[in-house]
């Protein structure tokens, strides 16, 4: 949701990648903004830095400034709240509430993914649109059917659904997302040797009894690779990831320290899957072989 919000503010000309946003979460001009717990920021942060660090405060403010109608229109333009039309039974629309029903609390939280619900295929299609220069295509399962003698009896033809943002905005947002997988970002573990990766972490609280749980999460990472000339999108989600956050609990349970955040749970799995798919598709590397084999310990890296 933060990436779609970034697309919206850039496409509307409200901000650029280097525009600086005040990070005071008790700003009197905003209503109950979600804090960046456990993180110490400078007084301001650029939109680019907000993507890299996954700032709840900045995106809460950006969404609030866009307003509910405009924010919801971009979410809808990216295919949220709609059936994608993929050739699978039982597809769900997700939940994209009517913006007329959004109060200040809801529309300041929608940019961080609260109050809305999306399916994996919707999110994959939205990120593919960013990789496709802002063009949203209908996802599909079967690319072609070939007979034993080599005759092609069916070939899928790409179907354009819409153009939610301009190619230049899509490129700018993709470039910002590359920082997520680099040093200082929330998902260094998603880096694929030899390839640039543009991605975003997700750490979503699971609703429980009318509110959001502080113990149950969906941890995810979605990436577009190679970022310089996108070929694939991979989305990995862990539902209810087991986590043990302290050394004391770890020793008592006899298990290693785990973390429920997308940058630690899902990012490494993304890296493993993307590495195999890129080789299978024979996609040429776009970066020197610079990605290290070893990644930082949990307490040395920022994850959200």
Briefly describe each language-model feature range.
Residues 4-247, 262, 266, 295-297, ...:
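Beta-lactam-recognizing serine transpeptidase/beta-lactamase-like catalytic domain environment
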Residues 278-304:
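Gram-negative outer-membrane assembly/targeting C-terminal domains
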Residues 265-272, 276, 287:
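Flexible, small/polar- and glycine-enriched "cap/hinge" segments at structural transition points
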Residues 131, 181, 271-278, 282:
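Short amphipathic alpha-helical signal-transduction/dimerization elements
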Residues 246-260:
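A solvent-exposed, charged loop/short amphipathic helix patch at secondary-structure junctions
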């Amino acid at each position: 949701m933060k990436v779609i919000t970034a697309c919206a503010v850039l496409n509307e000309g409200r901000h650029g990648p280097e525009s600086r946003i005040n990070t005071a979460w008790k700003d009197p001009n905003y209503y109950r903004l979600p804090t960046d717990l456990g993180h110490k920021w400078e007084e301001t942060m650029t939109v680019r830095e907000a993507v890299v660090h996954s700032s709840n405060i900045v995106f809460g403010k950006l969404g609030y400034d866009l307003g509910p109608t405009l924010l919801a229109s971009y979410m809808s333009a990216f295919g949220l709240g709609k059936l994608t039309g993929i050739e699978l039974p039982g597809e769900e629309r997700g939940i994209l509430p009517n913006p007329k029903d959004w109060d200040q609390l809801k529309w300041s939280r929608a940019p961080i993914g609260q109050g809305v619900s999306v399916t994996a295929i919707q999110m994959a299609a939205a990120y593919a649109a960013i990789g496709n220069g802002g063009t949203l295509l209908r996802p599909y399962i079967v690319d072609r059917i070939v007979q034993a003698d080599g005759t092609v009896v069916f070939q899928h033809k790409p179907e354009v659904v819409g153009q939610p943002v301009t190619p230049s905005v899509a490129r700018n947002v993709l470039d910002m997302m590359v920082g997520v997988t680099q040093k200082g970002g929330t998902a260094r573990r998603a880096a694929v040797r030899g390839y640039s990766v543009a991605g975003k972490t997700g750490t979503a609280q699971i609703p429980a009894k009318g509110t959001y749980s502080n113990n149950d999460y969906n941890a995810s990472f979605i990436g577009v690779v190679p970022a310089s000339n996108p070929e694939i999108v991979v989305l990995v989600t862990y539902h209810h990831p087991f986590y043990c956050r302290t050394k004391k609990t770890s020793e008592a349970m006899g298990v290693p320290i785990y973390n429920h955040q997308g940058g630690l749970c899902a990012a490494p799995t993304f890296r493993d899957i993307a590495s195999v798919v890129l080789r299978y598709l024979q996609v040429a590397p776009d970066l020197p072989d610079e990605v290290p084999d070893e990644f930082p310990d949990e307490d040395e890296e920022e994850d959200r």
